[in-house]
Amino acid sequence: MVRFKELAELFEELERITSHKEIVRKLAGFFGGLKGDEVKDSAYLFLGSIGPAFENTTLGIKDRLVTRAIAGAYGVSEEEVKKRYARAGDLGDVAFELSKKREASLTIEEVFKRLRQIKEASGKGSQEKKTGLLSDILQKATPEEGKYIIRIVLGRLRLGFGDQFLLEAFSIAFTGDKKHAGKIKESYSVCTDIGELAQTLAEHGAGAPGYFSIKPGRPVKSMLAQRVESFEELEERIKGKKAAEEKYDGERVQIHKAGDEIKAFSRRLEDITAQYPDIIEAVRESISADTIVLDGEIVAYAELEKENTRIEEFYPFQNLMQRRRKYEVEKYREKCPVAVFFFDILYLNGESLLKKTYPERRALLEEHVNGSGIVHLTRRTVTENIEELEDFFNETVEKGLEGIVAKSMSSNSVYEAGKRSWLWLKWKQEYSEGMRETFDLVVVGSYYGKGKRKGSFGALLCAVLNEEEQQFETFTKVGTGFTEADAEEINSLLSAHTVSEAPKNVIIKKGMLPDIFIEPAVVIEVLGSEITNSPGHTAGEGEEETGLALRFPRFLRIRYDRAPFDATTVREIRDLKEGI
C-alpha cells in the first residue's frame, strides 16, 4: 500500500513545477505505481476533493474548528495557533511548523477514509467529532502530511492545475500513450466522476472508453453553442432546415429521474436539488417516465393575468441567483418564482440518447414531457428561411429574452457532451446591437479603489483560459458596470481567495501587477466592444504573437454557475478577433 507521505511529497514538488509536460509526467509516474482504490482516491485528492463534483464533498469544517484540531493535536493553545496563522496566512503551514518529525505510517487509503469520516459526521456533537477525527490523524502525520491534510480539509490545496492534466496523465499511465487523451476527455464528459474514470482506465487500459455511458444520478457535461457574427454566418454554418429555440437568461440544469428519486444538477455538475423544491415537485407531477435525463434552463418566471390575457413575465438572472441560497429556501421560493424550460432529452428508460439526432431527441422530449405552470418545453420554430429566423429572433428579444439558439437537424446532429459545438449556434441581442460579445472571465487580481470605491476595489484584473497549458492569461481590467451591491458581493467572494503572490497558473506581466492577487475561483460576465492587440496583456501571447485585450469592458454579473475552467478561452477570443 502506498504511503500518504509519497503523495504529500509529490504535492510539494508539483507546487514548484510550472512546466505542463513535467507536471503530467510526474502525475503519470505516480498513478502508474498505484493499485485498487488508491487510484480512485488519489484522483480525487489531486483535485483537493474526496469525491466527484456532483456529490457534496465539503467536509463541513472551517478555520475555527481546524484551529482547535491543530491545537489539540500538537498540545498548544488555540491562541498560539491563531498567532501563527496570522503570520503564515496558511493553517497547513502552521500544522507543518508545530508537527514533530515522526516515521511515516499513514497510507493513502487511511487518510482518504478519515476525510470521508469527517465529512459524514453529523447530528448532535458533530463539530466535536469532526475536530477529534482531524486532531487524531494529525497526531499520526508527518509535518508534510499534516500540511496537506489541512489544506485538503479546508479546500485550499492549490496545486495550480485542473482535471485536464490528470486526463493526460491517465492516458500515459494506463494506456501507455498520450494519444488516447482525446478519447479519455470525451469519456470524462459522460463519466464525470474522475475517480471512477481513473479506476476503470487502470483496469481496462485503452479499451476503457467503451465502458462509459450516461446514467441517472451522474450528470454529463453540457453541450454548448458556438457564437456567430451574423445571420449570414449562421445560415452558412447550418445549411438547409434548422430549428431555432428561444435562449433564456437563466441557469442551465440537468434533471435526473430514477423512479421516485429526482435530482437537479448545475452546469458545474453541482447538486442543486435542495434549492429548487418547486421544480422537483413539478417534474414529479409532469413526467411519468421511470428513468429520464433532461437538459434545460431554470428561469425566474411567472405567468400573470392582465385584462383576461395570459402574460409571460421573465425576470433578470440576478433574481434567479437568490434561489441558490442554501438557507431560507421556502422564503425565496415565494419571493422568486421559477420555471424550467426543457430543450433536450439525454436518457430514457434505460437507453442513452446521446447518439440520437436532434429531431429524434426533440420528438421524444415532446412525447414524454407534459407542460405545467412550472415545466415547459422551449418554444421554437423550424425553418429554412433566413427572414423567418430573423423574425423569430426579434420576437424573442421583444419578450425580454437573450436571443436564439439555432440547431442543426442533420443526420449527425448528436448530443456532444462537454463540447462547444457548431451543431448549435447562438445569436444574442448584444450582437445585433453592435457589441461584439459577452465573455466569462476569471478574476485574478484587484486594484485599490478611490473616492466612492475607497475600501473596495477600483477595478478587477480578469483573465481567459489557455486550454492547452491550463493556465489563466490576463485579458482586461474591468472598472465599470458595478452597482454598490455588486461591489459588496464581489468583495465578499474575493476575500476567501486572496493570496500573497500570483498563482503559478496565472500569467501576468509586470506592468499589469494588481494590488491584490486572487486565486482563480470567481467568474464574472463582461461585455466588451472590441478585441485588440496589447503588449500589456498575456492572453494568447506567443513567440510571434502579441497579447490580446478587450476594449471598453463593462461588468454584467457574477457567474455562480461557471467554474474557472469553464471560462472563455484563448482560442475563442482569437477566433473572434480573426472573424472565424
UniProtKB/Swiss-Prot annotation:
It holds the Pfam family DNA_ligase_A_M. ATP binds at residues 245, 252, 267, 297, 343, 420, 426. GO terms for molecular function: ATP binding; DNA binding; DNA ligase (ATP) activity; metal ion binding. GO terms for biological process: cell division; DNA biosynthetic process; DNA recombination; DNA repair; lagging strand elongation. Keywords: ATP-binding, Cell cycle, Cell division, DNA damage, DNA recombination, DNA repair, DNA replication, Ligase, Magnesium, Metal-binding, Nucleotide-binding. Gene3D superfamilies: DNA ligase, ATP-dependent, N-terminal domain, DNA ligase/mRNA capping enzyme, Nucleic acid-binding proteins. It is an enzyme of class 6 (ligase). Belongs to the ATP-dependent DNA ligase family. This is DNA ligase 1.
